């Protein structure tokens, strides 16, 4: 969709917002239905949202970044979708985008260790077709290369000894 196009009933649109409070950032995204959407669009949105929570459940102190990506990727691919690889989640703190990168694909037990106090954004971007995307000339708009539907959900979480804590519930 071109940024000049108007949204119509049946479209889905992703909105990604950041906020800053007392010098610290938060990052949150969701995909919304414009009116009634096709069963395919609803299923894609539901799968993407649930893959976010699969990733969050895998974000345990002592685990690895790859555990998160593997949880997201396994859930998504088991349902016939693909995970965008060009964009990933990230650390969050005094800057909106910090290390470490948090891919939505990966191998369990690989990557940096998750430690209590780490704050990260997990943000699966899931395509109904292939995983390739293209950035439009405006430098912001991203479309799937094959024209398929895509959905995106994100939460900022803190790793704690008692499990992950979601910081961006709205």
Predicted regions and their residues:
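Active-site neighborhoods and metal-handling regions in enzymes and metal-associated proteins
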Residues: 1-170
